[in-house]
């Protein structure tokens, strides 16, 4: 069956083309316009959407088919009398064929046998058929339907003879009166006339007001009824178009009309045609032949390739001169971190070269295999109609493991409670480095060393287990030795929550110190319960109650004050109340946590620390969280893999198996993993190697695509407007406690009007910016404000690598103005400080003429004469607004001295220079803010 156009099918169903297009869209079929053709399955779906209209449209063509069942060509002429059944009963509704039609029939002897079996007048008026009364029941409402819009069925065609004075389809004019103009010449079939004997399709399809019109110059109605159609015209109303196999075989002398394209109403002049229709319509899209002859035959069906190209053109978008597949705005594309344009092109089945051009049009330059960041993919997705989702590292690693049939969440969910056994609690000790934390750890270890192990512990691996007797039951506790709290922050930044309880050590004679507050912030941010150990109570200046009062300000309320935090007064030097501290840890674990694990499966856990030993290779301290780790197991730790060759405990003894919460040293890995990387045991070494290689590739791509800055003051207001951020986190470091307090109070008083944005200071402290500050800013997406302090060299590199924004001020009002403008979105162009280099003072030479001369070694960059400089001593800025007044190398004046060379630096009248100071040089460059 030939394909149907949308507007034709809509007319057949009695609906508008717009309604048909909307219905097709709801059915999941995307059609560009009403002139598009649709396949038979789509036609069937649209017909089924309008069951009532489909039946009424099909009845006129199916009713007269019964008397002509014996003839294969009968279905074509059988459609002619059907409009009589739906037309209003009148004398003018059934006129006899006129003389012109009679002459046409007389000159065609081969057509004579056709009308015999096809006379359908009695069959069309049979009242017993249930289908016949439906079209005739509402003649007024049938006007827009195809049956009612067809030309008058009973009117004879005067023929398309160009020499006839009545020639043409005069009856197709909707405004003509029933009387007609008998002798009016019809110039429509003049080959030199522009109309070419054809009325417009709109006029042909318009219903006749006032009923059918008798033919021009015709006599009264013939008693024999209307002349049956003998030609092979176009598709009957409500039915499919005919194909060449349905053409009547006996009609050979007359020229045939265009295949399947004519409306009901016959072919060209002199040939067979249906009565009453406009003559010689060659069909939509075909050229009309001269003298009423049909145009050339229509081309055959489109090939699958042509159909596919047409479909792709309908669903593509042209950007920058190239066409790429477009989405509907809801299509989700999931991309891994560090994905490239080639990955994006593979997802949408497009040419990667076209995407490179599209991205260039959008103002971004990238190659096909270059790793891109999330913002670039979001820009490209918004332009093409796709929602881009960058897979998080956790989900990416989960999908990677699922590719090897490893589902950790499913394993945990399917755990049988009968297999779960209690496990020891994991405890991390934190606090100020001078408050006895290390001595307390040594006291706990020494008081629990196995008998016969004289001399204490032989080596420290950073984690150990001690037995504790509690209520007559032998229990165990696992302690993680983290010097400072750097490793703890790094593990939290990578999402490895291995700590169950945190012990905060505070010296009773010193009180709460800046690093104590910093450790407290880390523990609270990790969401673990805290036990406070008040150390050094044996000193005369100890004030444990003062410590309790100070920590109450930070949310740690002691139990004796009505809170839920346990405070234990201990002395690590004299071993006072060590057992009570261990008991408090156990009570906190029992009250707040339910610690169980399944030891009867492959081991899973996390790496606490790792180092490279010259004799043993990669040495990794791991903490088993679930399962049991055995010697000989194949394991993968982050991007490292290998077979466990040996395991050792905290005492250096060889261990064959490690159960949950047991820390051990592992030998045999291929490389040194990072602290906080998770590990798992695999079935074979090949699987472990493939997992490690894929993790390494993913990390490498993520690093390539990583932006230098996460959130800066310049783009803070844009992030707020997009709903990505509603809180600005700050870390304030200064050279004096009073300055830090004043800066914090001033910042918290900033008013931002109706669009209020929360300002939160997550950490404040005195001293130089440390690595822990950068780690905390990385986790909480914070901005570091430095007031008269500078970071160390390694800290600056870490901040640059992690994308942390650090701002330095020496006037408090400048910091307040910058933060206020950031909150209000009113940042203006600024001057940017560009570092030139730094030099370390090795020796100070005193001169009565030039003052103090700093004999220095250039550590980085270069030192340039007349450049601006500052003097930094122990991480604190001693003097600002200095200038390199004199610069010499081996008693000769120099314009600049580069890295690795020694030089003499004079700072003019400033003489407060000491050995170990650092002279930093810089210049100010104007930087427009965008």
Curated annotation (Swiss-Prot):
Q: Where does it reside?
A: Cytoplasm
Which molecular function term from Gene Ontology is one that the record holds?
translation initiation factor activity
List the Gene3D superfamilies hit by this protein, alphabetically: 1.10.10.2480, P-loop containing nucleotide triphosphate hydrolases, Translation factors, Translation initiation factor IF- 2, domain 3
- Which regions are flagged for Basic and acidic residues bias? 308-320
Q: Give the signal peptide, or none.
A: none
Q: What is this protein called?
A: Translation initiation factor IF-2
Q: Where is the tr-type G domain?
A: 422-596
Supply the Pfam families for this chain.
EF-G_D2, GTP_EFTU, IF-2, IF2_N
Q: Which NCBIfam families match?
A: IF-2, small_GTP
